[in-house]
Design a protein with these regions (language model features):
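ATP/Mg2+ or Mg2+-diphosphate-binding catalytic cores
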Residues: 178, 182-226
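ATP-dependent phospho-/nucleotidyl transfer catalytic cores
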Residues: 1-97, 108-110, 209, 214-216, ...
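All-alpha amphipathic helical-bundle segments outside canonical DNA-binding/catalytic cores
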Residues: 165-180
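Hydrophobic "anchor" residues on beta-strands that sit immediately upstream
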Residues: 93-95, 115, 127
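Conserved protein kinase catalytic/activation segment
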Residues: 105-116
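Conserved catalytic-loop position in the HRD/HxD motif
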Residues: 99, 119
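Active-site activation/catalytic loop segments of kinase-like enzymes and analogous catalytic loops
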Residues: 122-163, 180-200
Length: 226
């Protein structure tokens, strides 16, 4: 609930860089039939409906809790959501953890040691930048994300390209914005139908929703969704 610091986000991103570069555009991932992609039939059949189920609740109850323009972003995305999912599947692909929230990250006592990720049950073959959009957009306080998101993205992009991978900055920025829009569906799930269970769960749901929508506004994410 407190959120990650910029230093913690850097450490997590450095670990993700190793994962992403190892599997970047690796065709052997396509042979893993159990490893989903963003447009897997199960996702196409459920995720847009989850998004739309939360929209009336967002409009009725959250307008004064989010940055100005957040509800307009949600409305604009509504008829474009399936097209967004198609674009997310276009690549470049790698092995993505796909659930990079703080609960799934262990930080070492010695900062020189790498962090460890757990809970790979949602891993998929998709753009690596999606892991950054999820981490920054949902696990950092809005002010921290606002101040550091571009530097964190440039850190990841620089290390990716330094490894010999060709990936333009403009594409990276576009793909980050698209991913930030996609993860609004998680907030819609929380406010639309998900039982948070207890006080901590409710606090986490509130933090997730405000952070992810405020981040989408801060980075002009909707500009990535014509």
């Amino acid at each position: 609930v407190e959120g990650a610091t910029a230093a913690e986000a850097e450490a997590a991103i450095d670990a993700l860089i190793e994962l992403h570069t190892r599997w970047w555009q690796d065709e052997s991932l396509a042979a893993l039939t159990w490893l989903p992609v963003p447009i897997a039939p199960a996702y196409l059949a459920t995720v847009p409906d989850i998004y739309r189920a939360g929209l009336p609740v967002l409009e009725a109850e959250w307008g004064d809790r989010l940055l100005h323009g957040a509800v307009d972003v949600a409305r604009t995305l509504d008829p474009r959501f399936e097209a967004l999912m198609e674009r997310l599947a276009a690549g470049p692909t790698t092995l993505s953890h796909a659930d990079t929230r703080l609960d799934n990250i262990f930080f070492p006592v010695d900062p020189a040691e790498p962090v460890a990720f757990i809970d790979f049950q949602l891993c998929m073959r998709q753009r690596g930048v999606c892991d950054l959009a999820y981490l920054i957009g949902t696990s950092m306080q809005a002010d921290e994300a606002r101040e550091h998101w571009e530097a964190l993205l440039r850190r990841w992009h620089g290390r990716i390209t330094d490894s010999g991978i060709e990936y333009g900055w403009d594409d990276c920025m576009l793909h980050y914005r698209e991913a930030a829009l996609y993860y609004l569906c998680g907030a819609m799930s929380l406010i639309g139908s998900f039982d948070t269970g207890n006080e901590r769960g409710a606090a986490m749901a509130t933090a997730y929703t405000t952070r992810v929508f405020d981040h989408a506004v801060d980075i002009d994410a909707i500009e990535a969704c014509p």
